[in-house]
């Protein structure tokens, strides 16, 4: 079963080396099962079949040629293209003609592939509409049907309709969808909520986890595990009963905890890290260590400037994408340099809070079904995780949660991810009060709360504010009795989004909120995106609670 495992170590004598090559690193457990960890695309009868391989694996040197030549400004465009004929025939044709003197790569691609459509570009908003009316009219624009794709593309089939974020993101995304669902519920779109509930349950049943998104190149990783929060929303909104999802929650939990039983202290496998005291915490991970299909050229360039083995950098870039915070100072050794990324060496506060929620949800639903042993087991797991988080990720001196660098055995940076323990009910009241003071003094602006207090040029840092962080902060602080702060964040965010909407007549992915003048957020690997799923969802929910700004 084991390819490599440390024999009879004494944890007290182990000194952690930060930058050992992964293949030789004794603190990274290697199990044979990891080779088979990535699932294959599933077919659904009556729907177009996806390609069995990712675009990079399918088109090989053609893929690298297209990406290196920068035929498209966005590296995601080619992976999202659909072939006009059998993909293998396209590759054979390319190999026959690529060395011809008059070979034109751009024309070859245009002749053999359908370019992805950007549906939202067809939509023109009515300036007379209120913010609420605008959002309600956007839902159909952002809805995709199961049959809305061409055979052999990278798009994974789903059994029901789904919402996409918009812009370059023409597929559904895991954690985005939860925040989008908040708005669907407020808009009375229970039909779409049911469809999305069925889709996510189907993905867990067929893939063993919910992929980052429904693309073949996303199958090797997930995103922040918010399915337990979705189930809670389905129950509250009367869409689906929570009991029907107990097995799905257990399956997702097994995915995140895979290999835990084989670990010794100071050792990790996939998503799990066993801490020096034997407790278990989690990290973000991707089962591949190659450049991301959708950001291939950017990843290759980043690795060139890292001074590390490229596959190590690719893994950390992929894990950063799995975090949803792609990218942020949270994952960087040098906050000004993406090439210093070390995502897999950090224990994230938000991930472990979401997993606490997952453990608690399994316990609660097991109790409803009379499964007392399962309830007791998962209550114990949730309690153990909370204790470990308090031991390693709570900064008592400053009254904040922080990520933890498990390779250097020290606390990492403070960010708005620290509010997730409040949102899932993991903090005590003293922690909530102290964290509120820190957020007020370090992250709060007239436009909402910043992603972090560090200005790095990455999109999940200052000066940007993001809808999901506002929602979790608002609800988290109110849950612990700080209505004043929760309401202030809510009204500030509504003002930000509405002011921008009145000027530009659109909703966007992120907002620059550092100086009190709302404008387009920047940073990251791609241009700012319109749409935008989770902004619409959070704002629509807030309008239901606070009225139109």
UniProtKB/Swiss-Prot annotation:
EC identifiers of the protein:
3.2.1.28
Listed PANTHER family? CYTOPLASMIC TREHALASE (PTHR23403:SF8), TREHALASE (PTHR23403)
* Keyword annotations from UniProtKB, A to Z: Cytoplasm, Glycosidase, Hydrolase
The protein's GO terms of the molecular function aspect are: alpha,alpha-trehalase activity
Matching entries from PROSITE patterns are given as: TREHALASE_1 (PS00927), TREHALASE_2 (PS00928)
Q: What does this protein do?
A: Hydrolyzes trehalose to glucose. Could be involved, in cells returning to low osmolarity conditions, in the utilization of the accumulated cytoplasmic trehalose, which was synthesized in response to high osmolarity.
From the record, give the transmembrane residue ranges.
none
Q: Which organism is it from?
A: Escherichia coli O139:H28 (strain E24377A / ETEC)
User: Where does this protein hold substrate?
Assistant: 168, 175-176, 212, 221-223, 292-294, 324, 525
Record-given protein name:
Cytoplasmic trehalase
GO BP: cellular hyperosmotic response; trehalose catabolic process
The reactions it catalyses are: alpha,alpha-trehalose + H2O = alpha-D-glucose + beta-D-glucose
Quote the subcellular location field of this record.
Cytoplasm
One Pfam family name is Trehalase
Q: How does it assemble?
A: Monomer.
Gene Ontology cellular component? cytoplasm
Q: What class of enzyme is it?
A: hydrolase
Pathway(s) annotated for this protein in UniProt: Glycan degradation; trehalose degradation; D-glucose from alpha,alpha-trehalose: step 1/1
> Of which family is this protein a member?
Belongs to the glycosyl hydrolase 37 family.
Primary location class:
cytoplasm
- Please list the residues that make up the active site: 326 (proton donor/acceptor), 509 (proton donor/acceptor)
The taxonomy runs:
Bacteria, Pseudomonadati, Pseudomonadota, Gammaproteobacteria, Enterobacterales
């Amino acid at each position: 079963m084991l390819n490599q495992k440390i024999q009879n170590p004494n944890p007290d004598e182990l000194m952690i080396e930060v930058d050992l090559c992964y293949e030789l690193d004794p603190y990274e457990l290697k199990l044979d099962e990891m080779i088979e960890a990535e699932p294959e695309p599933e077919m659904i009868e009556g729907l177009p079949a996806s390609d069995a391989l990712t675009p990079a694996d399918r088109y090989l040197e053609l893929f690298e040629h297209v990406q290196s030549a920068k035929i498209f400004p966005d590296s995601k465009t080619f992976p999202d293209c659909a072939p006009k004929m059998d993909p293998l025939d396209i590759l054979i044709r390319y190999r026959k003609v690529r060395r011809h003197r008059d070979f034109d790569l751009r024309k070859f691609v245009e002749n053999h592939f359908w370019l992805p459509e950007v549906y939202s570009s067809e939509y023109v908003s009515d300036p007379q509409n209120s913010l609420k009316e605008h959002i309600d009219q956007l839902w159909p624009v952002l809805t995709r049907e199961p049959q809305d794709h061409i055979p052999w593309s990278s798009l994974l089939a789903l059994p029901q309709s789904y919402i996409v974020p918009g812009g370059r993101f023409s597929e559904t995304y895991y954690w985005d969808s939860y925040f989008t669902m908040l708005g669907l519920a407020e808009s009375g779109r229970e039909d779409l909520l049911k469809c999305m509930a069925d889709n996510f349950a189907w993905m867990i049943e067929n893939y063993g986890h919910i992929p980052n998104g429904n693309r073949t190149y996303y199958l090797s990783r997930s995103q922040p595990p918010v399915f337990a929060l979705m189930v809670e929303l389905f129950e509250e909104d009367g869409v689906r009963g929570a009991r029907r999802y107990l097995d799905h929650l257990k399956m997702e939990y097994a995915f995140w905890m895979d290999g835990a039983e084989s670990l010794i202290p100071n050792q990790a496998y996939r998503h799990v890290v066993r801490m020096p005291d034997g407790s278990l915490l989690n990290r973000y991970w991707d089962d591949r260590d190659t450049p991301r299909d959708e950001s291939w050229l950017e990843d290759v360039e980043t690795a060139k400037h890292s001074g590390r083995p490229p596959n190590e950098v690719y893994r950390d870039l992929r894990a950063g994408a799995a975090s949803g915070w792609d990218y942020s100072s949270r994952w960087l050794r040098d906050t000004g340099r993406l090439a210093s990324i070390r995502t897999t060496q950090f224990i994230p506060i938000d991930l472990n809070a979401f997993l606490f929620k997952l453990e608690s949800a399994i316990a609660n639903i097991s109790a409803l079904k009379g499964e007392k042993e399962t309830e007791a087991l998962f209550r114990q797991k949730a309690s153990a995780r909370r204790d470990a988080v308090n031991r390693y990720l709570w900064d008592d001196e400053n009254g904040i949660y922080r990520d933890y660098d498990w390779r250097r055995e020290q606390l990492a940076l403070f960010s708005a991810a620290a509010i997730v323990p409040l949102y899932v009910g993991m903090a005590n009241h003293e922690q909530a009060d102290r964290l509120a003071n820190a957020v007020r003094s370090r992250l709060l602006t007239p436009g909402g709360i910043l992603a972090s207090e560090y200005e790095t040029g990455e999109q999940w840092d200052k000066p940007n504010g993001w809808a999901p962080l506002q929602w979790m902060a608002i609800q988290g602080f109110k849950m612990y009795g700080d209505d004043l702060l929760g309401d202030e964040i809510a009204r500030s965010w509504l003002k930000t989004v509405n002011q921008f909407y009145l000027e530009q007549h659109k909703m966007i992915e992120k907002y620059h909120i550092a100086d009190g003048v709302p404008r387009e957020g920047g940073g990251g690997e791609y241009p700012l995106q319109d749409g935008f799923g989770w902004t619409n969802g959070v704002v629509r929910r807030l309008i239901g609670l606070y009225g139109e700004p």
